[in-house]
Amino acid sequence: PASVGQFSAVGYFFGRMLYKALGIPVGLITSNWGGSTIEAWMTVDAIDATPGIDHAVAKSGTYDNSIPQRLYNGMILPVCRYTAKGFIWYQGESNRKNWYDYKALQVSLVKLWRETWGDGKMPFYYTQLAPYRYEGDTLRSLPLVIEAQYRALAEIPHSGIAATTDLGNPTCIHPA
């Protein structure tokens, strides 16, 4: 419909699928910012509590969408009092520089969000990064971020991942 033009396509189609499966209206809240890093969606305390990561790199964001805690404060906290039954997440492209920390950061993010909503079992589903044609070092780091996403899956209960390797459009970073 025309009313969803600015809404996340992934979020819209996921919500539509839920509606068809459940047969009841489904409300969706979108909190997204293109090109953001995972650290921006976390508190500084959660980053500090994440073991084994390069904390200096994790806290080195300089743009609004990469500054630790900026998007958590501005886009997560304002909606955390709403009833929610789960999360979907499609992010990671901007963490190619610190792919080696992505698994630990994603595990910590899920823990933080579940604590924020007061439900340690809230489902968390996410999308594998698409096979986009990056260049140079970022081309080499893409499969490493994807591997980190799958390794995180093994440590996050009540979670799932949507594979995108079969989409076959290397010129579109977010294929629909």
Feature-to-residue mapping (PLM):
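Cell-envelope and extracellular/periplasmic
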Residues: 1-176
